[in-house]
Amino acid sequence: MLRIADKTFDSHLFTGTGKFASSQLMVEAIRASGSQLVTLAMKRVDLRQHNDAILEPLIAAGVTLLPNTSGAKTAEEAIFAAHLAREALGTNWLKLEIHPDARWLLPDPIETLKAAEMLVQQGFVVLPYCGADPVLCKRLEEVGCAAVMPLGAPIGSNQGLETRAMLEIIIQQATVPVVVDAGIGVPSHAAQALEMGADAVLVNTAIAVADDPVNMAKAFRLAVEAGLLARQSGPGSRSHFAHATSPLTGFLEASA
């Protein structure tokens, strides 16, 4: 069971809504993933009506919506988008995204921290997308963010956990949930994130662009479950030396 702020989730896999070939395929993949928290970009949704092609099927699916501020380049733009989302969707949950460079889509640490502090004060449950910077993640936690979402690699790159060393530090020091976001390309990446101690992962591109998004979503669900179970089972420690799995000495002595 995963708890973030006032909500609990059975699934440790969060999903996105971008890049799917159709809304129907998006919903089928989300259902196959078992995800209960789904993020959507406010710039892609018609907030004036709930029969929007993206919004309506998500509401019907009964998932928790996590609007994000993707497209915002400054703290001010992100805060404006947050208030629009709260008014239109009736939720104070927010994935905070601020990336001024359209080429790399890397989060702006200064603007993100600035916006996060203000949004928390305004009553939002803030989940910030951020770089894998242990100091920044601690600062975001200190200003009241409900979780931190450090990247594994650049958005949509499918490179995996390129920031593993920093993620391990973030996880070790965090007192709020850590959700690895961005760069996860295959189910094994997700399993590794859960094994190393992450509380959840957010996956979008890897599912949406797969030849079979529904089965890929199912694969991610199983990988996350496996990674979590492996961590809870207490894996053996790594060693530089070989250790025999059978006690050969006793066998030889008995045969003598």
Curated annotation (Swiss-Prot):
Main EC class the enzyme belongs to: transferase
Subunit structure: Homotetramer. Forms heterodimers with either ThiH or ThiS.
Known function: Catalyzes the rearrangement of 1-deoxy-D-xylulose 5-phosphate (DXP) to produce the thiazole phosphate moiety of thiamine. Sulfur is provided by the thiocarboxylate moiety of the carrier protein ThiS. In vitro, sulfur can be provided by H(2)S.
Pathway this chain belongs to: Cofactor biosynthesis; thiamine diphosphate biosynthesis
Name by which UniProt lists this protein: Thiazole synthase
EC number(s) reported in the record: 2.8.1.10
Active-site residues from the entry: 95 (schiff-base intermediate with dxp)
Organism expressing this protein natively: Shigella boydii serotype 18 (strain CDC 3083-94 / BS512)
Keyword Cytoplasm: yes
HAMAP family, alphabetized: ThiG (MF_00443)
Single GO BP term: thiamine diphosphate biosynthetic process
Pfam families in the cross-refs: ThiG
Predominant location category: cytoplasm
Annotated binding of 1-deoxy-D-xylulose 5-phosphate, by residue: 156, 182-183, 204-205
Molecular-function GO term, any one: thiazole synthase activity
Family membership noted in the UniProt record: Belongs to the ThiG family.
UniProt-listed InterPro entries: Aldolase_TIM (IPR013785), Thiazole_synthase_ThiG (IPR033983), ThiG (IPR008867)
Keywords: Cytoplasm, Schiff base, Thiamine biosynthesis, Transferase
